[in-house]
Structure formats: structure tokens, C-alpha cells
Curated annotation (Swiss-Prot):
This is DNA mismatch repair protein MutH. SMART domains: MutH. The gene is mutH. InterPro entries: DNA_mismatch_repair_MutH (IPR004230), DNA_rep_MutH/RE_typeII_Sau3AI (IPR011337), DNA_rep_MutH/T2_RE_sf (IPR037057), Restrct_endonuc-II-like (IPR011335). It holds the Pfam family MutH. It is found in: Cytoplasm. The lineage of its organism: Bacteria, Pseudomonadati, Pseudomonadota, Gammaproteobacteria, Enterobacterales. Belongs to the MutH family. GO terms for biological process: DNA modification; mismatch repair. GO terms for cellular component: cytoplasm.
Length: 228
């Protein structure tokens, strides 16, 4: 009979977190869920964040989807990323919710996107649909910080997208805007509206938005480190 797993305390440092993540490499979602006595959803359509929550549980993360990093005390964000058999990302990566009001004085240096991406523990997970969720395995972890070129690309896109928000043009932004960073609606249903600024500076109600990393940003990042 399997011994149930008790979630660890938050890691004391980066090395401890990385070693914990390495221990998960090669294990399947089914094995991890069984040890934690957690039910496995039939698929991820309604439980998009399930894989991330399962790995957070095993690594002692605490932030959930709050603005701070998952491991705020050691300055690290956890990002799971579904990949195909070649290690190529299968979808964009959610970074954080975009603030649609109260943005006076905000700069790249002080924004949530930069804080979240300053140090990331990437964990690739098998994500091809033909592999049943329970059989999908965890890949080797990677600790990453943006290099100068990556940071510049992110900053440029963030500033362009924030200009749309501040100037009341948030509803003009499409998925085509941004070279590596996208601004997209983030709501499970279209009735969940939030306040934003309209073209004439008036309050409007619109869908919540989130910042997402494009696959053309995460693919080379993974390829460089895993020599895909």
C-alpha cells in the first residue's frame, strides 16, 4: 500500500527547491496524485491549473495565483509548461493578471510581470493529448532568469501593451500584439467583468486580461537548456 505524501515545508533556498523538483522528474501525474490522495480530473478542460497545483503541493509553494512569486521568500516563480515529445511548448504560458486600473507611476522595473519572471523554475510536463493525463510524466527542471536580450524583448512588449491599457484602448489589443508577450482575456466565462479605462478616460467594464508568454519565447529558452 502506498504511503501518503505529506507536503513539505517551503524550501529554504534555491538549491533545496531545485533538488525537490529533480526528484519529481520521470514520475507520472497518476503516481503523484495517488501519493497525495488527490483525484485526477478526466481532462484539463475545466481544470487547467491542476498540473501546476499538484507540483506546487509537492514543492511546498504558497502563493497560488496571487501577484507575488510562488516561492516569494526565495524569489522564485514556478511555471509548469506542457511540451510535445520533442520538448516543444504546446501552449502559451500565463504570467500574471494584468492591472487595468491604478497604473499611474508603474514602470517595468516595478511591475508584476518582471517580478514574476525575474527567476523561474520551469518544469516541463508531457502534454500531448493522446497521452492520458494519469500517464503524463514530469520532465527535468530548469532554473532560469532572463538574459539581457530576453529582458529587453519583454520590457518592450510590456510597455507597448501597458500603453494600450493606460490610454483606454485595452479592447483594441488582439493576440497579434506583442512579439513575445501577449495580453489576452482571462476569464472562464464572459460574464466575469472587471473595471478598466475607456477611450475617453471613463470607467468601462471589460473581461479581465492576463499576460502570457508566447511559444516563440519559451521554445528557444527550453531548447537552449535541454539541447532539444
Amino acid at each position: 500500500m502506498n504511503t501518503l505524501f505529506s507536503p513539505p515545508s517551503p524550501p529554504d533556498n534555491e538549491q533545496q527547491l531545485f533538488e525537490c523538483a529533480q526528484l519529481l522528474a520521470g514520475l507520472s501525474m497518476g503516481e503523484l496524485a495517488a501519493k497525495a490522495n488527490l483525484p485526477i480530473p478526466p481532462n484539463l478542460k475545466r481544470d487547467k491549473g491542476w498540473v501546476g497545483m499538484l507540483l506546487e503541493y509537492y514543492l511546498g509553494a504558497s502563493a497560488g495565483s496571487k501577484p507575488e512569486q510562488d516561492f516569494e521568500h526565495i524569489g522564485i516563480e514556478l511555471k509548469t509548461i506542457p511540451v510535445d515529445r520533442r520538448g516543444y511548448p504546446l501552449e502559451t504560458t500565463f504570467v500574471c493578471v494584468a492591472p487595468l486600473t491604478g497604473n499611474s507611476g508603474i514602470t517595468w522595473g516595478s511591475c508584476h510581470v518582471r517580478r514574476k519572471l525575474s527567476r523561474v523554475l520551469w518544469i516541463p510536463v508531457e502534454g500531448e493529448r493522446e497521452i492520458p493525463l494519469a500517464k503524463r510524466r514530469v520532465g527535468s527542471p530548469l532554473l532560469w532568469s532572463p538574459n539581457q536580450e530576453e529582458e529587453e524583448l519583454l520590457r518592450r512588449d510590456w510597455e507597448e501593451l501597458m500603453d494600450f491599457i493606460v490610454l483606454g484602448k485595452v479592447e483594441s489589443v488582439t493576440a497579434r500584439h506583442g512579439e513575445v508577450l501577449q495580453l489576452r482575456p482571462k476569464a472562464a466565462n464572459s460574464k466575469a467583468l472587471t473595471e478598466a479605462i475607456g477611450v475617453h478616460g471613463q470607467p468601462i467594464m471589460t473581461l479581465p486580461r492576463g499576460f502570457y508568454l508566447r511559444k516563440n519565447f519559451t521554445a528557444p529558452l527550453l531548447a537552449r537548456h535541454f539541447l532539444i
